[in-house]
């Protein structure tokens, strides 16, 4: 096929016998026909991978099990589970798999099992949002289990259910914007210990269920949500530290080069092998790397091939080094398994951050994975199973106070009760602005109870009726009420500069009793922040009377609260 020529080719699969347990792709390549000064004959000038057929569902991991998991032993806060060829412990204080041993080999050292993780060492393109991640404490999340239950199932498995709150003790800040002035000192996060986080500060709540099978396989199924659904995260998933000897990394997914949601189609779905740290591209400024999308399975083994089923450094170690030579000696293999990782976008020199489908808002995510023992040469066979563990009930309350329960099961009824009251079968969203303790379980399995506590909703959702001035596009007035601190309202400046005063009419969607006003300033700079303010209320949107509050806000990024002298109806 010559330059600028077009032809239709038909690929005939008629004589090819497909294995229904495998998925198939076809790779198309355009090769250089003759040697050129810039490349040899056969050089791949273009290639594409096209899907042909999907694999049939693999058998359930539970189907091949024999025997039963022994009754676990409880020693203090640890639940110890052991069987033929495996030992593992779970921590009732954190809701985590605390340690894991297969065949006498330590796979997870005590305290380094899977923990919720939403942080990454910022890339150059993350400058559209990275300043927020330390403020939210994503680098320093601490897990606290608020509910626990265990159950030996009829099919011989052990089920451990946890509700876990993950929150930092305080937020932090850094001087990353000054990196060109003193690059040796600006990459550290400085925690603000003077402002400890409270129950209303950013946190995750996870309902998670571990299932241990008789052969030592352990499955995690979780539902993860946060109390700030509009916040933009770099990732959401689990991280664990494994012994550094487990440094042979194999995976079936896109590769071999790092890829992200918005930069992945050039890397094909194949089985890839290599050493941890040598499969990635180290940049002059160490930063997040090694991500692979569309991964079906991954395996880590040592030189002998013994294993469990991946970077030499943690995200904080990568972030803290100005240059590669300043990275510390590796002490572990850091494995991340993520429900979603934010794309890179192009904000360092292009159109902005990732597009909406490639962002990771702090809303709800279902995620699960299965850990199994493997040996060299058996990886593919061990991975040909599907999860079978119980999946948790999701409890979500929206900004209007409506509480909903969702599950991945179409025909399983959910039963709930509030503040220890009468159990009720869930039929429709429940008004729940006053908050309280909620317990929920499947009607056919009362042994696994998910528990979550919601605080009383004090704020009144607002909509905008009128705005005297706004910069259309990214800085419109809709951002004043979108509950997203990364966006902001700015008065017009592109066509003309609007003069003071500026005003906005808000609608509370009915008469409400109000006792104050909360204002979140622009987070990434002073332009557009409010200095002097006056607050008026009205019953009809026409007659406003005298201001019920007025004053001056400080020029900073901290949330401001104005308490009225007495509650008012508006």
Residue ranges and their predicted role:
Residues 1-21, 30:
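Intrinsically disordered, low-complexity Pro/Gly/Ser/Thr-rich segments with frequent PxxP/GP/PP motifs
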Residues 7-11, 365, 428-430, 502-504, ...:
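Short strand-edge motifs at loop-to-beta-strand transitions and within beta-strands
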Residues 12-21, 36, 50-388:
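Beta-strand/loop-rich accessory regions of lumenal/periplasmic or secreted enzymes
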Residues 30-38, 445-447:
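Short acidic/polar inter-strand loop motif in beta-rich domains
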Residues 232-236, 526-534:
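Short coil-to-beta strand junction motifs in C2/discoidin
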Residues 389-475, 480-485, 502:
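Short, compositionally stereotyped local motifs that mark structural "simplifiers"
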Residues 453-510, 522-529, 543, 549-555, ...:
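Disordered, acidic Ser/Thr/Pro-rich linker "stalks" and the adjacent N-terminal cap
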Residues 566-570:
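Noncatalytic modules at the cell exterior or secretory-pathway interfaces
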């Amino acid at each position: 096929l010559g330059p600028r020529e077009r032809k239709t080719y038909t690929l005939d699969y008629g004589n090819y016998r497909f294995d229904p347990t495998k998925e198939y792709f076809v790779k198309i390549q355009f090769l250089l026909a003759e040697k050129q000064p810039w490349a040899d004959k056969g050089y791949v000038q273009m290639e594409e991978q096209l899907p042909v057929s999907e694999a049939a569902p693999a058998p359930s991991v539970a189907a091949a099990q024999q025997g039963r998991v022994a009754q676990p032993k409880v020693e203090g806060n640890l639940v110890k589970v052991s069987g033929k060829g495996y030992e593992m412990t779970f921590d009732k204080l954190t809701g985590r798999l605390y340690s894991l041993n297969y065949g006498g080999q330590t796979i997870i050292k005590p305290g380094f099992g899977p923990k919720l993780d939403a942080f990454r060492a910022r890339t150059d393109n993350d400058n559209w949002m990275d300043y927020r991640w330390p403020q939210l404490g994503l680098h320093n999340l601490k897990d606290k289990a608020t509910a626990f239950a265990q159950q030996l199932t009829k099919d011989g498995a052990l089920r451990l259910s946890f509700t876990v709150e993950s929150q930092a003790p305080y937020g932090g800040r850094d001087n990353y914007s000054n990196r060109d002035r003193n690059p040796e000192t600006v990459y550290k996060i400085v925690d603000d210990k003077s402002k400890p986080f409270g129950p209303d500060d950013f946190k995750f709540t996870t309902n998670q269920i571990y299932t241990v099978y008789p052969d030592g396989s352990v499955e995690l199924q979780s539902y993860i949500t946060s109390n700030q659904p509009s916040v933009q995260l770099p990732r959401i998933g689990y991280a664990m530290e494994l012994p550094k000897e487990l440094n042979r990394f194999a995976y079936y997914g896109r590769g071999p080069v790092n890829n992200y949601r918005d930069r992945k189609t050039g890397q094909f779905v194949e089985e890839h092998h290599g050493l941890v740290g040598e499969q990635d591209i180290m940049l002059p400024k160490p930063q997040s790397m090694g991500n692979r999308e569309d991964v079906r399975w991954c395996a880590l083994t040592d030189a002998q091939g013994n294993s469990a089923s991946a970077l030499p450094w943690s995200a904080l170690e990568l972030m803290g080094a100005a240059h590669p030579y300043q990275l510390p000696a590796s002490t572990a293999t850091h494995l991340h398994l993520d429900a979603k990782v934010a794309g890179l976008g192009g904000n360092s020199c292009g159109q902005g951050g990732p597009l909406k489908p490639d962002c990771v808002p702090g809303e709800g995510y279902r995620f699960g994975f299965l850990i199994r023992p493997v040996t060299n040469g058996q990886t593919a066979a061990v991975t040909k199973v599907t999860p079978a563990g119980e999946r948790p009930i999701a409890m979500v309350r929206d900004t209007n106070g409506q509480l909903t329960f969702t599950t991945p099961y179409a025909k399983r009824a959910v039963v709930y009760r509030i503040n220890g009251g009468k159990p009720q079968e869930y039929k429709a969203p429940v008004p729940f602005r006053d908050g309280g303790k909620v317990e929920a379980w499947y009607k056919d399995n009362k042994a696994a109870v998910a528990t979550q506590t919601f605080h009383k909703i004090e704020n009144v959702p607002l909509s905008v009726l009128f705005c005297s001035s706004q910069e259309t596009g990214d800085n419109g007035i809709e951002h004043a009420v979108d509950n997203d601190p990364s966006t902001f309202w700015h008065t017009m400046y592109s066509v003309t500069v609007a003069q003071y005063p500026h005003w906005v009419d808000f609608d509370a969607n009915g008469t409400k009793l109000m006792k104050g006003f909360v204002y979140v300033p622009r987070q990434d700079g002073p332009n557009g922040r409010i200095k002097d303010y006056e607050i008026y209320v009205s019953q009809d949107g026409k007659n406003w009377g005298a201001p019920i509050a007025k004053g001056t806000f400080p020029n900073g990024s901290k949330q401001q609260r104005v308490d009225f002298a007495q509650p008012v109806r508006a």
